[in-house]
Amino acid sequence: MKVNKLDRFEIEDLEDSLALFEKTFNIKLENTETQKLKNFDEFCDLIISKFKAESNNLCTSQRAFYQFRKALKTENIINSTSISPNTDLKIIFPKKNRIRNIRKVEKHLGYKLEALKPSQMTINFLFFLLILSIISLFFVWKIAIFGILISFTGFYLTKFTNRLDKKTIRELIEKTTAQNYFQIRNAENSINKSEFKTVILEWFSENAGIKKEKLKYGNFA
């Protein structure tokens, strides 16, 4: 087991994401509790202790997979018997009609898959261009304004990206399970505590932008 020390910026990203997690899962962590934590594992234990709901053995990710497979069959996107968790998403959603088919599945499921996402390189480039353009306002304002317009136009166009965020069905299911946990279980009064650490890890990895391998064994100090 490799222990990783999270840097100051990663810890700040976790703290920034925590408010959304608390709202999503309807819990509250006190500052006096979080200040004592030494690592991400203790953080997960604290979160789980806040759930007073009934714990049962329903495997939420498995249920999410079956719901996803049923949606594919119902919407006539692909023969559902031919897919498995390791199936490449490009096979399920080829470029032609990708956005339309994903929306059809989302409508059937009743929640967003968030399966499409621009590359981090694109986001970084647009952000860098925006910062550079703002700084340039003091020197060559006409060019700077043009750069700002390109940046905002680029950020707007990323909403229509056709790029798949995950590679396999398994990766997509892990993400959607974390983001729509109670909706997939169809109950807000129960959790599966044996799987919930994985859900917490996936959720914060996705929302704080920290790799799961680093976050799982991450130390705060």
Residue spans of the language-model regions?
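Phosphopantetheine-dependent thiolation modules in NRPS/PKS and related acyl-activating systems
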Residues: 1-19, 23-221
